[in-house]
């Protein structure tokens, strides 16, 4: 919002309206010891001087070759995403409750829902959630409502930050969260089968998981359904250009983080979460839902539908508790998907996979380094090093390379391991620079 200062005439008019003679009189009730004496601000400068100052500050930034993933990824963003999402018609925090005023926004969000359903292989989607972690937690709450049960089973190879969010949601409502240990970077199937008792509402997995491994979840889906539990799958959307959709593998609820779909890395946000499910569970879906309808004159239109689930009607019993501002990030996701297209998503996913495979082979050939992933990976993989991974990451950062995510903080016994991510933006030269720096640090 532009800064609009009050003119002396504005101030006089406002003071007269409330019966005050001066600004000093207006603030009289505030004790003088609590009032700011001076803001210690420098004098104003020109636009050109301000630009120079900002450039000086920007020059202080360190630009690293980025191999960090773990949930947020350094993908290319087409210029059209910024161009269209920045239009004034979209760039607003307004919730489109009045369909007669909001057809453009409503249609864009309707198309977003369609895109998410096509991407995940599911039947219905909402208009976005906060981020991937809260989307996973909302999926757990949704499964609890649907089944009426009080246990959730979650694979330890789900992103540790997302697991913490789920635990926070569940810890004070009498629900037990059971973590299944990992085995060589994948879910321990025998431990999962043992944990699947008759009171489990959901089995929660991630594919590809935090270590980068891809799994066929069909067997896990069948085991969960045999016990009356739902399968909740967290996915990395870019990977769905290459691997089988969670809907095809029997997932009941699919969630994920949309940062990789046209949203920049900006200190961890903002982003958006997505959630999709089957039609029979639509009334348990959190968040806003956009529906298509026909008006009395026979024209196609869009509205917020199933609003009885929302806060302004159900209050504390609402399943919808998501603010409007995430819609802008979701719009960026839609523009990204539309600009890349179906064939482009396949090409993008293959490019990520191919570059990661090259990096995995190159880094795995370094003496003392071992690739932990036994099966297929997408654009992330886990390395075991002959020394503490956090120390190695710090050393390589001094050389201008952000080498990966050390795992010692999140997994016991894995202090020597780190997850490396290779997106389409990383070049062969940058991968070689990582390999040489890593070899020199060991």
Swiss-Prot record:
Q: Which keywords does UniProt give here? A: Oxidoreductase
| InterPro entries found in the cross-reference section | GcvPA, GDC-P_N, GDC_P, PyrdxlP-dep_Trfase, PyrdxlP-dep_Trfase_major, PyrdxlP-dep_Trfase_small
What EC number(s) are associated with this protein in UniProt?
A: 1.4.4.2
Q: What processes does the entry annotate via GO biological process terms? A: glycine decarboxylation via glycine cleavage system; nucleoside metabolic process
- Transmembrane residue ranges: none
Where does the secretion signal sit in this chain? none
Per the record's keyword annotation, is Cytoplasm included, yes or no?
no
- Give the catalytic activity: N(6)-[(R)-lipoyl]-L-lysyl-[glycine-cleavage complex H protein] + glycine + H(+) = N(6)-[(R)-S(8)-aminomethyldihydrolipoyl]-L-lysyl-[glycine-cleavage complex H protein] + CO2
The GO terms describing molecular function are: glycine dehydrogenase (decarboxylating) activity
- Give the superkingdom in one word: Bacteria
A Pfam family per the record: GDC-P
SUPFAM superfamilies per UniProt: PLP-dependent transferases (SSF53383)
Q: Work out whether the entry's keyword set contains Oxidoreductase.
A: yes
What PANTHER family would the database entry show?
A: GLYCINE CLEAVAGE SYSTEM P-PROTEIN, GLYCINE DEHYDROGENASE (DECARBOXYLATING)
- To which protein family does this belong? Belongs to the GcvP family. N-terminal subunit subfamily.
Q: What the protein does?
A: The glycine cleavage system catalyzes the degradation of glycine. The P protein binds the alpha-amino group of glycine through its pyridoxal phosphate cofactor; CO(2) is released and the remaining methylamine moiety is then transferred to the lipoamide cofactor of the H protein.
Name assigned to this protein: Probable glycine dehydrogenase (decarboxylating) subunit 1
Per the UniProt record, the source organism is Geotalea daltonii (strain DSM 22248 / JCM 15807 / FRC-32)
Taxonomic lineage from the root? Bacteria, Pseudomonadati, Thermodesulfobacteriota, Desulfuromonadia, Geobacterales
Gene expressing this chain:
gcvPA
